[in-house]
């Protein structure tokens, strides 16, 4: 079968019909992007109705045989749901590199096929129709792409009861699909120009070159969005990403007038989100303290009462931190050390809140980046917060999935909770540990915390009850030694699990070795043969992989697991 498309000469009426067809298929592509979220809502409503009917009183019972058959069929289907969900949530590894999760690949392949079908259907033999269709279908996805990236007003996060850091996975998937379609669009147009002998004439025409410039910017955006680049310098990725987000829309707006509706949508939601984020950001006075004997700093910021109440109601949430002009380094407003903080908004998990004093506390490990280094430079070695000098910090939040689903965790009948943390991942785990114990006193809650040295736990020694968390029988600390917890690399969020020699530590610390996650998980499930189990983790990649691998056999046996991995991998 040969190439079906040809260079056709169309009449004005045929060109008009082609334009109508382009707009029609672009609208379909644009609106259909909301279908997955709507389908999710529909399934959730169906499940809610099914549960309410099954728990309701039936005045006239149906046939026992038919009823039993229906219940067996429904039970089988519903029983496979958690297994399928777990399978889709598994990571994909290829040649030692992480390639996202299975659900990203499934959705990405399906969505690519759908958009390619919309790009091809109805084009006939018209080569330029196919070329233009690829471009406008790709552009119709840009508002969705921007929506998926929003932090404060992300509608997909609202519908899916998630948070932007999880939705951002699909932002990356859709970005690659758009890039793929626009690459095909550019290749086909270049072939047309070359075959028609007008490449030099058309390539540098303003309307065409605007598209070329936009494509170059998109190359830079996708290049810096690669995982290796983000790990080497998140700062470069973020700055290029932000500048590209502003540069690409006006270039496409000029290049393709038919796409202006979608470009306007994209810019509108992006600017609106920035405005909302600006309004919810608090400039708070804060005390920054260095924790002696560690590379940790503890930040205690004084927040307005309404804000601190919001954070207190959402345990395990995180904030975005920005250093305002008053607290920045540099000799002037145009110096590089000063300007770099215009682009830095780093995530930190809220370790604790105190509604009486209005204090919000988070902990950071000093690394090679400018943000944690600036916090270290601002820190005071004294532990006397009253005498320490206060600095201004911009705090935006709260964010995080767990804050939205915490009520489900409490009310869903879960009887056993296992929380695993590595290093400063305990800033996520400890507030949840206290909150679950406070809200669900009958649940058995266990906290596993792996740290490099006992000094790394000093910031968490106090609890809302006044009793040290280190004296809690349900909290197990594992000291991994100097080689245990993360170094200064970006991947090292908590602990690299190696054995260490015995040493004298706090009386509550009984484990001078790496945690045996397989045994811990097996014991958790064996002690609760019929109970629902919640497992939450915040730590380095290797810890999360080992924990999930240990849980997988139990999920495949049909155990109901409420799983949450708190990570900042975007």
Task: Report the location of each language-model feature.
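Helix-rich terminal scaffold detector
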Residues: 1-157, 172-177, 181-183, 193-224
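Transmembrane alpha-helical segments that serve as helix-helix packing and pore/cofactor-lining elements
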Residues: 152-172, 222-239
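Non-transmembrane, juxtamembrane loop and terminal tail segments
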Residues: 55-89, 289-308, 484-505
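Ferredoxin-reductase
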Residues: 288-394, 451-452, 479-481
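Transmembrane helix-loop junctions at the membrane interface of multipass transporters and ion channels
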Residues: 7-19, 191-199, 226-239, 245-262
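Alpha-helical transmembrane segments and their membrane-interface exit regions
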Residues: 141-145, 220, 268-278
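Classical protein tyrosine phosphatase
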Residues: 55-61, 135-139, 168, 172-185, ...
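Reductase modules of NAD(P)H-dependent flavoproteins
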Residues: 2-16, 166, 344, 355, ...
């Amino acid at each position: 079968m040969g190439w079906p498309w040809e260079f056709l000469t169309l009449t004005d009426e045929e060109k008009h019909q082609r334009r109508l067809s382009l707009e029609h298929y672009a609208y379909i592509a644009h609106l259909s992007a909301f279908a997955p979220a709507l389908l999710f809502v529909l399934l959730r409503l169906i499940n809610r109705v099914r549960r309410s009917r099954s728990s309701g009183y039936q005045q006239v019972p149906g046939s026992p045989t038919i009823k039993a058959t229906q219940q067996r069929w429904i039970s089988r289907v519903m029983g496979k749901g958690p297994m399928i969900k777990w399978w889709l949530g598994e990571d994909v590894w290829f040649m030692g590199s992480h390639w996202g999760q299975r659900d990203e690949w499934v959705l990405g392949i399906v969505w690519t096929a759908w958009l390619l079908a919309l790009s091809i259907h109805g084009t006939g033999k018209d080569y330029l129709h196919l070329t233009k269709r690829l471009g406008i279908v790709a552009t119709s996805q840009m508002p969705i792409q921007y929506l998926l990236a929003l932090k404060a007003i992300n509608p997909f996060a609202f519908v899916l009861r998630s948070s932007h850091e999880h939705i951002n996975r699909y932002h990356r998937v859709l970005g690659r699909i758009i890039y793929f379609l626009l690459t095909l669009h550019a290749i086909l147009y270049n072939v047309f120009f070359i075959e028609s002998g007008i490449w030099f004439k058309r390539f540098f025409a303003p309307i065409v070159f605007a598209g070329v410039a936009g494509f170059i910017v998109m190359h830079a955006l996708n290049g810096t969005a690669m995982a290796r680049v983000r790990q080497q310098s998140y700062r470069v990725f973020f700055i290029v990403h932000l500048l590209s987000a502003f540069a690409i829309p006006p270039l496409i707006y000029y290049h393709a007038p038919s796409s202006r509706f979608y470009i306007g949508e994209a810019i509108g939601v992006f600017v609106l989100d920035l405005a909302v984020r600006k309004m919810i950001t608090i400039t708070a006075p804060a005390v920054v303290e260095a924790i002696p004997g560690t590379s940790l700093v503890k930040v205690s910021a004084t927040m307005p009462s309404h804000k601190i109440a919001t954070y207190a109601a959402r345990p395990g949430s995180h904030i975005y931190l920005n250093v305002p002009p008053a607290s920045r380094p540099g000799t002037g407003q145009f110096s590089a050390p000063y300007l770099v903080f215009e682009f830095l908004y780093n995530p930190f998990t809220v370790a604790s809140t105190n509604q009486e004093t209005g204090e919000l506390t988070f902990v950071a490990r000093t690394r090679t980046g400018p943000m944690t280094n600036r916090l270290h430079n601002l820190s005071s070695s004294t532990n006397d917060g009253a005498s320490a000098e206060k600095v201004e910090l911009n705090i935006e939040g709260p964010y995080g999935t767990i804050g939205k689903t915490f009520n489900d965790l409490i009310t869903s009948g879960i009887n056993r909770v296992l929380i695993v943390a590595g290093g400063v991942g305990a800033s996520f785990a400890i507030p949840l540990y206290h909150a679950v114990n406070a809200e669900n006193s009958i649940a058995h809650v266990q906290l596993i915390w792996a740290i490099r040295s006992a000094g790394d736990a000093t910031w968490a020694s106090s609890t809302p009850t006044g009793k040290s968390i280190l004296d809690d029988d349900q909290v197990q600390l594992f000291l991994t030694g100097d080689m245990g917890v993360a170094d200064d690399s970006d991947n090292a969020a908590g602990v690299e699990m190696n054995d260490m020699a015995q040493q004298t530590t706090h009386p509550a610390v009984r484990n001078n070795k790496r945690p045996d996650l397989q045994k811990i998980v097996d014991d958790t499930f064996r002690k609760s043969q019929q109970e629902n189990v919640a497992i939450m983790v915040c730590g380095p990649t290797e810890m999360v992989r080992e924990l999930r691998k240990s849980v997988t056999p139990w999920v495949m046996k049909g155990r109901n697991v409420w799983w949450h991995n708190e990570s900042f991998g975007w």
